[in-house]
Amino acid sequence: MDLENNTIHCSTFVQHTYIKLNPVGPIGAGRLPETRSVEEAQQYPTGWKFWLTILTMSALVVLGGLDTNIVATAVPSHASTRTPSPAASPLSPPATQRSSALTNRLTSVLSASYADSDIRDALETLSLRDIHNTPEVRRQLRLDVQKEVVDCNAEIVRDFGKVAEQLKRIGTVITSLNQTCDEMRKHISLARQDTAPVLEEASTLMNQKKEAETKQQLLDAFTKHFVVPDDDILVLTSLEDPINDQFFEVLARVKQVHRDCEALLGGENQRLGLELMDKSSRNLNSAYQKLYRWIQKEFKSLNLEDPRISSSIRRALRVLAERPSLFHSCLDFFAEARDYTLSDAFHYALTDAVSGTAGDSNVKPIEFSAHDPLRYIGDMLAWVHSTTVSEREALEALFVADGEELARGIQAGLSSEPWSRIDEHEEVAFDGQKALSDLVNRDLIGVSRALRQRVELVIQGHDDPVTCYKVVGLLSFYRTTFQKLLGPNSNLAELLVTLEKFTFGHFEALMKDVVSSLSTDHLALTPSEDLSTPQFLIDALEGLTSLMKTYEASFGADDTESTSDENRFTPVLRAAFDPFLELATSSAEELSNATARAIYLTNIHLTARTSVSEYSFVSTTHLNPISTKLSSLRIDLLEIQHRYLLDESGLQVLLTALEPFSPSSVAKSSTETEKQDSHPLESQPQQQPNLADIATLPAFQPEALIAVSQQLDDFLPSALMDATDNLKRLRSAAFVKSVTEEAVEAFCRDFEFVEGMIIGADEARGKVDVTRVDRGSETGAESEKGMEEGENGWGLRRLFPRTTGEIRVLLS
């Protein structure tokens, strides 16, 4: 075992020594890398391995762990042909066994890794000793190392001896310290026993001190929060002290105390909370009463025209809103004061004198224009409007500028005064604009009363319908203005609605009076000789035109609700147009001549249509009835002209004679025949009129027919002029022309019918009536005799030579 250990240590030592001191082999095999193991080094030349083996064996010999004979046997010669010596000791093991053991040992040594850090450190230490690789050094190396180890151990022992001496001294010191500590413990124990009662008493006193301090802090906090100083209470309730910022600060603090008292009522002992709440309630009531009186005093001297209204008044009103009863009472007082002030100002503007004081000489009183109702009423309404706007702006700055604050104050007041609610479940929301409008309405009650009296007096004393209607338009304009300014339910808006109805009623009464007086004036209702429009209707239409212009200027562009049946101007037409038109129409009954009556009515309706057609808001309701009436009158005039042409030309005689032969008469006869009871045995065949019979009619006898033809020839040259002159009293030339042209066209159609009958009669006279011949009656014989006379005698066409073309040319 020792040999094995020595071999391992020697091989390690040799390997490190070789690498460190002899990097190049004796035969130049090359440098062995320091990090290579023996297995890795086997790839180098054989010389390197040989020298490594020699060094290993030498080390073993030096260390005494291996016999030199074994080394000689184990190490091969440098030449490959060298063989081991056959000589062997008889007492030694066989050479083969020794060689095998050594080989195994060397193999294990050489197979070990020489890159171990311990081996490198050992070789490094060996290299630092500055020794030489000699046999002597190699033999003494172990001894030297052991000697150094022994020396080092001896030095360590000496050092530990010194340490032991120091430890003894330290132990002595520690023992002394322990004795001292024991004595101190005894003294401390005795002192603790003596001071324990004192400490307990001191701890008790400290706890009591803390409790007292806590109670003092609570008392201070309670006093600071719940107790109001007497000086502050005096500021809050004394009538001599002014209303200033300090008053509102104290009031806010007292209200906070009153609210916080509810927390004190939540405990078992409620006496303190009840007392504080009762005291704060009394103080608050006194403060609100003081504030209420102060606001009333300020309202008496308040000038709303001053743009710098005191901010303290606005603040006081916001605070007073928390007491709804006092707040509304204050508003009532303010409304009464403003009502008196504005009524006085309105009277001053009307008369320029209030309580004997003279007015401004540069401004004339409104009543100076009382003779002109329109201007007088307009000036009063303008003053009221200006005053309303100024009042609203001033009150808006006073009340509505802080509308949210007022709303919160009123809500808080309703909570404190639940009896102020009408319905306990209603939710009250403060509407600043509505409240402002209501207050302005109350301020203007006296002004509204005076305005109504004066307007009614002026209207009742005026008789001009046009002026009355202009006043209606003026009132309607201001009604719309005040509805936008104060709301549709305001007093002023309702007053103007009433005045508007009153004025329009007076207008209707005036128009009824005019119509009533005309209906009894026989001279005015008598148609003129020229059948022109009566003068009273012309005057009425002129007044109506003024009314329509007034309406158009005021409401025409905004009248978007008008329909074909009704609009805002329709009542005016019913009062100022329809009665006069009916009166003029009824006056035509005095004319016995139908032509004159038709012309007179046409002139009336043409004039009326001209007046109403210029304005859309009138034409939509009244133009259609007038146009319908004119269409009916036009038909009558057309019939008159047609009859005039037939009578003057003599053609009416021929048409009357030919009436049985007209298509309408034949159709009528056929219809009456079909209505009769028809049986095959009883019915007779319907006989068509024979055109040949026309020549037998009296009107178609030669003398009569020649007279008609001559009358026609005399009429035709001036027929158109005569027909136009027949309607010369009609005021519309275009109307006369259109009616005459249609009458001429009807006359031409009638002449064409007569001409056709004459030609047909002449043609029929050249034929035999088969039905009469078959019956063999005397009529058939007479017809044959007449035909013979027609062939040798006169013809209808020759006696009446005019043609339809000639007639159209002459009448064109």
UniProtKB/Swiss-Prot annotation:
Task: Report which superkingdom the organism of origin falls in.
Answer: Eukaryota
Keyword Transport in the entry? The reply is: yes
Protein name (Swiss-Prot/TrEMBL): Conserved oligomeric Golgi complex subunit 6
Q: Where in the cell is it found?
A: Golgi apparatus membrane
Q: What does this protein do?
A: Acts as a component of the peripheral membrane COG complex that is involved in intra-Golgi protein trafficking. COG is located at the cis-Golgi, and regulates tethering of retrograde intra-Golgi vesicles and possibly a number of other membrane trafficking events.
Q: List where Low complexity composition bias occurs.
A: 77-96
Q: Does the keyword Oxidoreductase apply?
A: no
Family per similarity comment: Belongs to the COG6 family.
Bilayer topology reads:
Peripheral membrane protein
The protein's organism comes out as: Aspergillus oryzae (strain ATCC 42149 / RIB 40) (Yellow koji mold)
Which terms does the UniProt entry file under GO BP?
intra-Golgi vesicle-mediated transport; protein transport
User: Which ranges are annotated Basic and acidic residues under compositional bias?
Assistant: 671-680
GO terms for CC? Golgi membrane; Golgi transport complex
A Pfam family name for this chain? COG6_N
Q: Which InterPro entries match?
A: COG6 (IPR010490), COG6_C (IPR048369), COG6_N (IPR048368)
